Each structure stands twice: as structure tokens, then as C-alpha cells.
């Protein structure tokens, strides 16, 4: 079994506040008493459901609304407080595969199938799950999840995105085991991660919904905190058999999905407790060191605790106009890099951005210096060419990036930059553009938090098929872009940390060694403080090398295509010759067949003529015999008539003689 995760994996070993959090859990809301593990299969009948739940919001997305109504109608025994968070098309493996749909809410995992009016309904309380694992269908296809409770095993397969589905189910399961309740903000973040822009909410609606204070749900009657703690310890003790190796294996499989950093599956500690509101003044010098009781970390980001020496230098994130875009949150991480250094890395012509551009096949980068606008914001424009690998588009596309540094930013403390990117040579480029928001917040002297959110903006509304094509390609490109950016920033962070450690080691040496090191120090400084002419020359060399590589690639591609076309021509000629031979053989065979038919006709004609002559002779012979017989009979008749005539003459003579005598 791959990627086995248990209930203890969500708890960090070094988290000293775990005991306090477990004692201060929000309690469950009272609801109807239902069986916590219901499995049924029945013939479908007439069922009606009265939609009268406590639904304090209205969603304009027909897709989510329809899914939620289906969920309510199919699982009427669940409490009204359970709202649909995600649904997945999958199949339940029993004696046969039962194709259906898996519904996930905050505390329940439900499956429903209807095949030829035969219903299969499964309801599993998340708190009853002992452990869950990623599995392979037929030990080959990695698209299955196995859910194990105390008495049963459920094997769900045919997931389209198994890793992403497993990650969300696992984290909600951990949330239930720790008696954590999702805040309204976390609920909406999960909803938007699973359903994306299909929710159709504008900025005002989102701000209003996120500003609603989450209701603390009371613990169900008749259940004490001691019982909860005992049940939670029992759950944990059942999962202790899994080692930390499974944790690392699961953490390695999570980034394969590419969706874990999206849409803020968990805000920072300071954000999860406060309401989203308008940006306050950035000139405030308020410094507060807080230790909030955080909810479950749904984004697997590190929330590093600051020591007392660095807390006084940090920026209070509550006083920062931080508002992510509605699209997706791709980066939310604390880097061991100062805020000023992070800004220089990302928004100047640094070696880091040059290396990053080369790795992303971005050439001909030209940028203007930062200029102050009339409103106080600073503006910078970049133009560059992107080498494309998509065969459906051209080889290159020109792009224009407009970067805006807002006036609320404070040097070395906080930077808020919006980047508007337009590509000019891709299909339907006049329909949309990309808006990226970079938020750099100082956390300590050599530490800052970087948040990058992005959204697709449309200049004119495309058709549904075109819109889905644009979003699919754009989101995949943005995801790979920011994954690479985060990876390079982590590498840069390790390099900077190593240089700081080396500097600390050098400072602790003897004075003689320190004197010798002074003479050796300017060498790396010279390499890091080269003139802009050297940088420009180096950039030109990189661009020239990139173009030579592209040209050589094009030449090789042309040669390969020419050879391929030549082979196709030779193949066509060979096929033509074979076809002509086959046609000639067919015609020859047809002519031979005609000649055979003609010869058969001649023989048959001769035979028929001979038969006719013989028949005519036989008929003539028979006719001659008949005529001869007729002549004989006529002769006999003639003789008979002559005799009769003679008899009559004799009688007449006798009568005349008698008359004379008398």
C-alpha cells in the first residue's frame, strides 16, 4: 500500500501548543441521531425532500447548487449543518464495480450510486475511519483510495485526480479527529479550490461572505470533554503503528497533484482568526506579538514561530492591505530571505531572474526602470519573448508585463505588486490576460513571507468551449511557472543561508586568519557587483546561445521532417507500383475469364446445333411414318368406298328389273 497516512501525521512533534489546542476545541453542533456508518442498497422509489435547511447563503453557481441539492436529497439522514465541500466521480469495488459519486462534507463521507434504478448508499462518519491508504487498481493503475473503519473496508477506484481527492479527504479526517471545525473562511477556500470559478462570486460577495463571523458550535448534549479526549486518544492509538516513513512518503506524493497550494487551503494564523476587511493604513507602526490558536493547516505551509528578538522587527500582518485575487493562490511560504532582498530578486534585473528566464525559455527581456505615477504608485514595464513548445501554436510569442508597485508599500517591510501579463501571439489572446499579485511581508530580519495569487481576466466573454480551453491551458502554464519560481527561490534561499553561515564561521576565527580573509573577501564581491555593461553582455550571450539552440533545434526538426516526407513519398510510389500490378493482374484474369466464357459458348452452340439436327431428323422420320400410315388407310378407305358403290349399283339394277317385270 502506498502513501498510508494516519491520524498522528497532522500533528507536528515540536508543536508545544497541541495540548492547549486539544483542550480548547469547538464542540459539535446538536443534530439528529443517525447511524454513523450506514450502508444500504435498495430499489429506487418515489422520494421527496423539502429544502428547508439552515442555508445562510445563496450561490449563483448552478453546478455547485445542483450538486448540493442532490447531496441533500440523497442523504436526508445527515444533519442540516453538513454542507457539501467536494464531490468526485468514482466507483465502489464490491463483487462488481458500482459506478457512482463520492460526496465529502466536513464530518461525513458519502457514496451514492443508481444503476438501472438500483440504489447503493453509503454514509461514513469521518471520525469512524481508522486509517486510509492510496491503492492501485489491479496493482497497476494508481487511481484508488481505501477507507477502513472498525468493521469494514471500502475500496473506491476510478478517481480522476486520486492524489488531490485523497489529500482533501485526509485533511478533513484529521480535522475531525482533532475536533477542529472549519471556519467560514476555510470552508469557502475549500469550496473555491474544488469548484474554481464556477461559483460565480464577485469581489463584494466574497468579501461579505468571508467577513461573516464563524459560529462556534456547542458540544452535543450528554458528551463531556473527557469522553472526547478518550475517544480521540483511542483513535490515535489505533494509528500509531504507521511510522514516520509513511509521512515522508505521503508528503512526496502530495505535490504531484499540483493543487495543494491553490486557493489558499489554509490561511496564515493571523488571517484565520480575523475578518477580511478594507486595507488599513500602511503607516501604522503597531507591533504586536501574538500566539493565536490556529485551526488545522490545510495548505501544508510552515508557520514558523518567531523568537523574541525578531518579533519586535516584524510587520504586523493585520495592518497590511493583503487581499488575494479571486483566482488561485500558488505560493504562500516563509523564506529565509529578507523582504528587501526578495523584492530585488523578483523585480529587478538580478542574476536570479536571468537564470529563471533562461530556464523558462524566455528571451529578449527588456525592462524599463521604476517610474512614479501621478497617484503615487510606481510602474515598470517588461517585454520579452517566450519560446513555446506547444505544436498547435507558433514557435514564439511576444509578451508584455506591466508591474505596479502600490504606494502603500514600505521599503524593507512590505511590498505589494500587481503584474498584468499579456501574450500577443497565442490563440484567443485578445480575449484574456493574466493578473498576478505578489505580496512580500517582512517576518524577521532575514525572513519574509511571499504570497502569490493569480487570476484570469477577460476583456470579452468567450464561448464556453473556448473559455474552458483558455482556462485549462492558462492554469496549467501558471502552475508550472510558479512551481518553478518557488523551487528556484528555495535554492536561492539555501545559497544565501549557506553564505550567512560561512560569514559567521569566518568571523569567529583568529585575528590573523581574519586579516587574511579580508584580502580574499573582495573576490566574490567583485563577482556580485559587476557593472551593468557586463550584465548586459552576459544577457546578450545568453540570448544568443538560446537563439542558436532554438535554430539548431529547428534545423534538426526540418531535417527529420524532410527525411520523414521522403520516406512517405517512397512509400507512396511503392504502393502505387503494387497497386498498378494488382490492377494489371486483375484485368488479365478478367480477360481470361471472358475468353473461357466465349469458348464455352461456342462449344455449347455446336452441341446445341447437332442436337437440333438430330431432333429434326427424328421428327421427320416419325412424320414420314405417320404419313405412310395415313396413305395406307386412305387407300383402304378408297377400296371400301368403291365396293360400297358397286353394291349400290347392283341393288339399283335389281330394283329396276323387278319393276319392268311387273
UniProtKB/Swiss-Prot annotation:
GO cellular component: endoplasmic reticulum membrane; endoplasmic reticulum-plasma membrane contact site; plasma membrane
Residue intervals passing through the bilayer: 557-577
CDD domains: PH-GRAM_GRAMDC
Start-end of Basic and acidic residues biased regions: 265-276
Organ and tissue specificity: Highly expressed in the liver. Also found in the testis.
Highest taxon, organism lineage: Eukaryota
Domain (VASt): residue spans on this chain: 326-497
Bilayer topology: Single-pass membrane protein
Amino acid composition bias (Basic residues), ranges on this chain: 507-516
UniProt-recorded Gene Ontology molecular function terms: cholesterol binding; cholesterol transfer activity
Residues of the GRAM domain: 70-176
Subcellular location: Endoplasmic reticulum membrane; Cell membrane
InterPro entries given in the database record: Cholesterol_transport (IPR051482), GRAM (IPR004182), PH-like_dom_sf (IPR011993), VASt (IPR031968)
Region (Disordered): 1-33, 212-294, 506-530
One BP annotation, GO: cellular response to cholesterol
Record comment regarding domains: GRAM domain binds phosphatidylserine in the PM and mediates protein recruitment to endoplasmic reticulum-plasma membrane contact sites (EPCS) in response to excess cholesterol in the PM.
Chain's role: Cholesterol transporter that mediates non-vesicular transport of cholesterol from the plasma membrane (PM) to the endoplasmic reticulum (ER). Contains unique domains for binding cholesterol and the PM, thereby serving as a molecular bridge for the transfer of cholesterol from the PM to the ER. Plays a crucial role in cholesterol homeostasis and has the unique ability to localize to the PM based on the level of membrane cholesterol.
Name of the protein in question: Protein Aster-C
